[in-house]
Swiss-Prot record:
Annotated membrane topology: Multi-pass membrane protein
Consequence when changing R261 to W/H/A: No receptor activity in response to MTMT binding, even in the presence of copper
Biological function: Olfactory receptor that is activated by the binding of organosulfur odorants with thioether groups such as (methylthio)methanethiol (MTMT). The activity of this receptor is mediated by G proteins which activate adenylyl cyclase.
Cytoplasmic side: 47-54, 121-133, 218-237, 293-310
Lineage: Eukaryota, Metazoa, Chordata, Craniata, Vertebrata
Pfam family, one: 7tm_4
Residues passing through the membrane, by range: 26-46, 55-75, 100-120, 134-154, 197-217, 238-258, 272-292
Extracellular side: 1-25, 76-99, 155-196, 259-271
Keyword Amino-acid biosynthesis included in the entry's annotation: no
Gene that encodes the chain: Or5ar1
Molecular function (Gene Ontology), one example: copper ion binding
Compartment list: Cell membrane
Full protein name: Olfactory receptor 5AR1
Alphabetically ordered keywords of this record: Cell membrane, Copper, Disulfide bond, G-protein coupled receptor, Glycoprotein, Membrane, Metal-binding, Olfaction, Receptor, Sensory transduction, Transducer, Transmembrane, Transmembrane helix
Intrachain S-S bonds: C97-C189
């Protein structure tokens, strides 16, 4: 069909997770609870770290920023998703779609670099303990975080420009619950080949550069742990990394599954649930992952609520 016969798309319509009205109510209640736990957990973690001087260390500075970016990208998606569960017409304007997309991409890609910075911090703490205060000074930590947010900003601009400079002049129905790359590319009436290559390359660079930093950091950490003679010392060293490894595995595993594939292999209905996992569930789990076995966080929480730590 001649593309000139199509009208230019000025708004999109989400299909959402389900079209069943009863399931929509159930999902609204479930995801509202999940999002509330997410907000309470991440805001609570930020407040705890800011207010307790015992947590004013590089490790918790990075954890505070992780909670911030988790809160950022989940809040770019969840409120709109919850509202759509209660409405029949899930319409979003072209500009609002671009804005949602931009904030989501910016925070997610910033998180990649925050996780890499956390891995580097663990490497220095375990492998270079005598030089820790110099290598992880306040200035270094600040530069690492500013660099993470700058990388997120650059990625935001690049992704948004590449995706929304395409022509959308056919169907405006997004088979998803938010504005994401694969369903948007599927709707474009432009030739998306070059954009797909550039987007894939950008995603690949961000993923693999940060994974490489994490992998190298943990390779040195593993060597250092093996050299520790006492079993107690090995366990203590490994316990400081266990939470971060869990968070990294969950986050990167899902993101790589979602984005580092050609669009021909996408099943949009199936991928919606993978998107739910990393946009809503992982941000909720991170405060739990990083605090459940952390004595410092538990002690700070007890102090905050006025209970003396044991």
């Amino acid at each position: 069909m001649d593309k000139e016969n199509h009208s230019v798309v000025t708004e999109f319509v989400f299909m959402g997770i389900t079209q069943d009205p009863q399931l929509q109510i159930i999902f609204f209640v479930v995801f509202l609870l999940v999002y509330l736990v997410n907000v309470i957990g991440n805001v609570g973690m930020i407040i705890l770290i800011i207010t307790d001087s015992q947590l004013h260390t590089p490790m918790y500075f990075f954890l505070c920023n992780l909670s911030f970016v988790d809160l950022g990208y989940s809040s770019a998606i969840a409120p709109r998703m919850l509202a759509d569960f209660l409405t029949k017409h899930k319409v979003i304007s072209f500009s609002s779609c671009a804005t949602q997309f931009a904030f989501f991409v910016g925070f997610v890609d910033a998180e990649c670099y925050v996780l890499a910075a956390m891995a580097y911090d663990r490497f220095v703490a375990i492998c270079r303990p005598l030089h820790y205060s110099t290598l992880m000074s306040k200035k270094v930590c600040l530069v690492l975080m500013l660099g993470s947010y700058f990388a997120g900003l650059v990625s935001l601009v690049a992704h948004t420009s590449l995706t929304f400079s395409l022509s959308y002049c056919g169907s405006n129905i997004i088979n998803h619950f938010f504005c994401e790359i694969p369903p948007l590319l599927a709707l474009s009436c432009s030739d998306t080949y070059i954009s797909e290559i550039l987007l894939f390359s950008l995603c690949g660079f961000i993923e693999f550069s940060t994974i490489l930093i994490i992998f190298i950091s943990y390779a040195f950490i593993l060597i250092a742990i093996i050299r520790i003679r006492s079993a107690e010392g090995r366990l203590k060293a490994f316990s400081t990394c266990g939470s971060h490894l869990t968070g990294v595995t969950l986050f990167y595993g899902t993101v790589m599954f979602m984005y580092l594939r050609p669009t021909s292999s996408y099943s949009l209905d199936q991928d919606k649930w993978a998107s739910v996992f990393y946009t809503i569930i992982i941000p909720m789990l991170n405060p739990l992952i990083y605090s459940l076995r952390n004595k410092d966080v538990k002690a700070a929480f007890k102090k905050l609520i006025g209970k003396k730590p044991q």
